[in-house]
A protein has these predicted regions:
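Gly/Ser/Thr-rich phosphate-binding loop
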Residues: 1-60, 73-79
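Active-site glycine-centered loops adjacent to acidic/histidine catalytic or metal-binding residues
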Residues: 9-10, 33, 66, 86, ...
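Adenylate-forming AMP-binding core of the ANL superfamily, especially NRPS adenylation
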Residues: 11, 42, 52-95, 102-106, ...
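Active-site phosphate/pyrophosphate- and oxyanion-stabilizing loops and adjacent acidic/basic residues
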Residues: 18, 63, 98, 147
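AMP-binding/adenylate-forming catalytic core of the ANL superfamily
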Residues: 76, 86, 91-92, 99, ...
Length: 167
């Protein structure tokens, strides 16, 4: 058998996923969830349709949050925020009805994460909504900037952190 690695939280850079497969021979899976949605909302794991792809192409596919877990519905609203509903989502924040009302609207939990849904119905997480950088009218996620920098072969580690600006 192969060693399997499951990563939850922000996906590692595509290059790291590729190296896990090619250099270590491990099988990579990506999970997405929040404390409020315990244990998870989506899962992305190797599947037969990825087999013909190159290691780099497979890594790019596996770096997304994947498809909804059993019994979970996800969508992205007009503002680009990821919403979810299922029976695993919290009923509310303890003794915080106002915060609960902000987080759960019309039965949909607002994750606070920005993202999109790809043509193959996988969820792509862009960034935490509050970490998006607005430059020249364009929304740029810190994850995208990290990925671009990390793709350079001389870069071993990188972290991009958005800092609020008056502009």
């Amino acid at each position: 058998g192969r060693v399997r690695i499951a990563v939850a939280g922000a996906p590692p850079p595509t290059r790291t996923i590729e190296r896990v497969e090619t250099e270590l021979g491990w099988q990579f899976s990506q999970l997405y969830g929040l404390t409020e949605t315990a244990p998870l909302l989506t899962i992305n794991r190797p599947r037969p349709e990825l087999d013909p792809l190159s290691a780099a192409e497979r890594a790019a596919q596996l770096g997304t949050a994947g498809g909804p877990a059993l019994g979970v519905e996800t969508r992205v609203n007009e503002q680009g925020e990821i919403l979810a509903r299922s029976n695993v989502i919290m009923e509310g924040y303890w003794s915080q009805p106002e915060e609960t009302a902000k987080a759960i609207v019309d039965g949909w939990f607002h994750t606070g994460d920005g993202g999109s849904i790809a043509e193959n119905h996988t969820l792509i997480i862009a960034d935490r909504k509050k970490d998006v950088i607005i430059s020249g009218g364009e929304n740029v996620s810190s994850i995208e900037v990290e990925g671009a920098i990390f793709s350079h072969p001389d870069v071993a580690e990188v972290a991009v952190i958005g800092i609020p600006d008056e502009k």
